[in-house]
């Protein structure tokens, strides 16, 4: 369970997230809003990429201020641009890096890497140069790099924005099939059809928190204002 208690945030005294309290328990949660609405700030607060200016973010009881490393072990984060996460020249090296930091036995490292590569049909690319992967393959590698660490929650920030339709569908399927809780910031409303809950942000405020049909109705109405 992720809990926000009276959380707010600002940049240079400009409020970007107004006081917010809520609890996230559902397995699939979408987050939408126009550019600058506060949705990406909200996402980054969930795994301690940002710390709140005020209030508390608790992940299974861990406070992001007091134990940010512990929170990041529980909450993985997938960026919009996979190049922000792919730092090694070979696919296998990229997946192994975080696991070696955990000081796992070599057999466990090998098993985890094999598992994620098989899941996303990347097995034949194990020794492939990372920069030669397609856009969709890079995003799947970024997701694999998070999942190989076995977090309990995964936050996605616009995971399909840079992809063509074919690769968008591959990444959308990967998100749907995740065993972990997924919290997805997106403009791709079709991605959210089967989600349990959608949060709508506008100008730093949460203006809707409902099942997809109701939340997206509010979002579309706001987006079509004159």
Curated annotation (Swiss-Prot):
InterPro entries: AAA+_ATPase, ABC_transporter-like_ATP-bd, ABC_transporter-like_CS, ABC_transpr_CbiO/EcfA_su, ECF_ABC_transporter_ATP-bd, P-loop_NTPase. It holds the Pfam family ABC_tran. ATP binds at residues 33-40. GO terms for cellular component: ATP-binding cassette (ABC) transporter complex. Keywords: ATP-binding, Cell membrane, Membrane, Nucleotide-binding, Translocase, Transport. Its EC number is 7.-.-.-. It comes from the Bacteria. It is an enzyme of class 7 (translocase). Signal peptide: none annotated. It is a peripheral membrane protein. GO terms for molecular function: ATP binding; ATP hydrolysis activity; ATPase-coupled transmembrane transporter activity. Gene3D superfamilies: P-loop containing nucleotide triphosphate hydrolases. Residues 2-225 form the ABC transporter domain. It is found in: Cell membrane. PANTHER family: ENERGY-COUPLING FACTOR TRANSPORTER ATP-BINDING PROTEIN ECFA1, HEAVY METAL TRANSPORTER. Probably part of an ABC transporter complex. Responsible for energy coupling to the transport system. Belongs to the ABC transporter superfamily. This is Putative ABC transporter ATP-binding protein DR_2469.
